[in-house]
């Protein structure tokens, strides 16, 4: 999950966006069909993840925006055709109107599929949250992002990571002045486990509900620098209203 990479150079902290997706570091290979709501956003290559929330709509991160996107559903090994995948072009791509590319606030986006997906054991929707999650809640993060905190290793097979939501105070202390009321941190303060480049836009699912979207962080799996996600619970009304209007 990293739209931002923070580098400490000569005592200065520099933040800049990167055109890469987030990945899973320190996780494990997901079992086949265990994350049926996970989608791959493709523009000739996998560049971000997303979550199917009904047969025709996907939630992803606003920083994953491209003018043309093919949504790939039912994927497990993205390097080969395994049968059962569904490739559907995006008909509409709608970033949150208050998305801020500098602060990465409101980093959420909706994608309307040009035709409804066929729902089955490989492709199914994840529920939107009924309420916001408590600190300590365990969540599942998944994606095809980088699996190394230093260097690169992009897996073909979907990777998973279980990680807890951290308290707001821990989150704000990790990123002073950068955490809005719309954001939450999750992961491990000791480092070693995180999302990373290539996982951006992908799901953070807690107790069967989509509570987060892989968004940003300082590097990947670095000590004291957990992953940051928008709180999907803050956007349920916007999601429902946008779907109804489109």
UniProtKB/Swiss-Prot annotation:
Binding-site list for Ca(2+): 75, 77, 80, 85
Active site residues according to the UniProt entry: 63 (charge relay system), 107 (charge relay system), 200 (charge relay system)
EC number annotated for this UniProt entry: 3.4.21.4
UniProt GO MF annotations: metal ion binding; serine-type endopeptidase activity
Cleaved propeptide residues: 16-23
Enzyme class: hydrolase
Residues spanning the signal sequence: 1-15
Main localization of the protein described in the UniProt heading: secreted
S-S bonds: 30-160, 48-64, 132-233, 139-206, 171-185, 196-220
Co-factor: note: Binds 1 Ca(2+) ion per subunit.
Domain Peptidase S1: 24-244
Annotated keywords: Calcium, Digestion, Disulfide bond, Hydrolase, Metal-binding, Protease, Secreted, Serine protease, Signal, Zymogen
CDD domains: Tryp_SPc
Subunit structure, as described in the record: Interacts with SERPINA1.
Family membership: Belongs to the peptidase S1 family.
Protein name: Serine protease 1
Organism: Canis lupus familiaris (Dog)
Gene behind this protein: PRSS1
């Amino acid at each position: 999950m990293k739209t931002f990479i923070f580098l400490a150079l000569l005592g200065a902290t520099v933040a800049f966006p990167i055109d890469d997706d987030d990945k899973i570091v320190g996780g494990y290979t997901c079992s086949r069909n265990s994350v049926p709501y996970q989608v791959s956003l493709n523009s000739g290559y996998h560049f971000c993840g997303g979550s199917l929330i009904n047969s025709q709509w996907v939630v992803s991160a606003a920083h994953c925006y491209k003018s043309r996107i093919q949504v790939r559903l039912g994927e497990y090994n993205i390097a080969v055709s395994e049968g059962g995948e569904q490739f559907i072009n995006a008909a509409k791509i709608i970033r949150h109107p208050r998305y801020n590319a500098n602060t990465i606030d409101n980093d959420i986006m909706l994608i309307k599929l040009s035709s409804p997906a066929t729902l089955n054991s490989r492709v199914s929707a994840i529920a939107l949250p009924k309420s916001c999650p408590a600190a300590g809640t365990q969540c599942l993060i998944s994606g095809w992002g980088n699996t190394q905190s230093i260097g690169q290793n992009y897996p073909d097979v979907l990777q998973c990571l279980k990680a807890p939501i951290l308290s707001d105070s821990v989150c704000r202390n990790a990123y002073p002045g950068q955490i809005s009321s719309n954001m939450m941190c999750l992961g491990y303060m000791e480092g070693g486990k995180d999302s990373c480049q290539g996982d951006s836009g992908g799901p953070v699912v807690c107790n069967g509900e989509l509570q987060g979207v892989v968004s940003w962080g300082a590097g990947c799996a670095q000590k004291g620098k957990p992953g940051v996600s928008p709180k999907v619970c803050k956007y349920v009304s916007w999601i429902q209203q946008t779907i109804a209007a489109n």
